[in-house]
């Protein structure tokens, strides 16, 4: 369940509402191109701007569309432990295979606070957790020692690591590699993370090039290092372009330019600037996507 290219899928909007038909089409596109699992309602899915009702509905649509063909890892995190528990309960009741649990953001808990947060979710809902460290967004960095403590809990099975710190990721595996699966949280570090002992990536670029992302990880698994490197460096300009502006602005703009979604976002996310849109379009054109 926790390996390969896992897509942090966008949430398409149309006229201010979730575009269910388009969402289902995106999920089919992923499954047909080798994606290993779907993560609805993550950062890339604009979970922060979804109401609780919408959040639940997006998870339900994803599960109905996937129909058990690949795992669904439902985004269920929050900066309120009780809210995260509520979202996790819904994910379990709906039939999700696991949840993605981001470290609480804005309130900047201590390492003990982080441990108690994830433990409380595990105690309340017996469902596998992929814990998610992304200090650039949350304002708090979960240290390897804390991850190792959490790895002792049966529900905590994997970590999406987006600190950008390979030394920190190596220490996680050094302390708890036999108990927890490491997944890259950054497309531009997927190959280095695999080399450390990681098992895959929760990917943004898989939204637009799912097959190449999946093939890269598969090549590494097959010990075809040359092919894995070739695909990694082919993908690198796309990985970098996905952060010309805040995620998911570039990836939704890319999908719009490719004709797959409307490209609508919710405030406070605004449309991409014309300058960056031109830069992005060039990268997509060079890749052969438009």
Residue spans for each PLM region:
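Active-site beta->alpha loop and helix N-cap motifs at the rims of alpha/beta catalytic domains
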Residues: 1-7, 11-139
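C-terminal alpha-helical cap/extension of soluble enzyme domains
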Residues: 4-12, 29, 33-35, 195-198, ...
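Alpha-helix N-capping/helix-start residues
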Residues: 15, 20, 52, 144, ...
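Short helix-capping segments at alpha-helix termini
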Residues: 64-70, 94-95, 125-127, 151-155, ...
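Glycine-rich phosphate-binding "P-loop"
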Residues: 133, 155-156, 266-267
């Amino acid at each position: 369940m926790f390996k390969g290219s896992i897509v942090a899928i966008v949430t398409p909007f149309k006229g201010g509402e979730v575009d269910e038909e388009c969402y289902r089409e995106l999920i089919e596109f992923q499954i047909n191109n080798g994606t290993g699992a779907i993560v609805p309602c993550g950062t890339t899915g604009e979970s922060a701007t979804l109401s609780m009702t919408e959040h639940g509905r997006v998870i339900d649509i994803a599960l109905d569309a996937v129909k058990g063909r690949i795992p669904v890892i439902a985004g269920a995190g929050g900066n309120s432990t009780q809210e995260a528990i509520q979202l996790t309960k819904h994910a379990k009741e709906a039939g999700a295979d696991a949840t993605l649990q981001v470290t609480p953001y804005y309130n900047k808990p201590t390492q003990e606070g982080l441990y108690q947060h994830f433990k409380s979710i595990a105690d309340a809902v017996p469902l596998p957790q992929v814990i998610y460290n992304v200090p650039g967004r949350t304002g708090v960095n979960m240290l390897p020692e804390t991850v190792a403590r959490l790895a002792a809990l049966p529900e905590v099975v994997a970590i999406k690591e987006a600190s950008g710190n390979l030394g920190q990721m190596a220490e996680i595996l050094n302390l708890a590699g036999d108990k927890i699966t490491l997944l890259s949280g950054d497309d531009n570090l997927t190959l280095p993370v695999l080399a450390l002992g990681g098992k895959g990536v929760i990917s943004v670029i898989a939204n637009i090039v799912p097959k190449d992302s999946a093939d890269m990880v598969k090549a590494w698994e097959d010990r075809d290092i040359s092919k894995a490197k070739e695909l990694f460096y082919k993908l690198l300009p796309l990985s970098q372009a996905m952060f010309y502006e805040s995620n998911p602005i570039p990836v939704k703009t890319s999908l719009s330019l490719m004709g797959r979604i409307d490209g609508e976002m919710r405030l406070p996310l605004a449309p991409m600037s014309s300058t960056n849109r031109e830069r992005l379009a060039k990268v997509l054109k060079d890749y052969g996507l438009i």
